[in-house]
């Protein structure tokens, strides 16, 4: 597959990446663990992405938590929103479709699938 032209990934002073794959153009100011990030994904300060796949051009805003989820392209997860649950053998994955906007502070619980919505 081809990667779009993008600058190298940037890890901010408080950003951390552990056991993850991060594509070109990503900006990491929060925490990314056991995850895969597509190109040009932004994880703002205080945000956590764990056990998740986040596709290109998505933004995880400050204080948001994304766990055990698949996030499609061009998704915005609002400040302090909570997507998914901690991964365990009984947990069900959350899927957010392309272009969804999750409002600040919204929780999306396990096993949900949303396509082309604004979650407020």
Could you say what each language-model-derived stretch is?
Residues 1-120:
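Left-handed beta-helix
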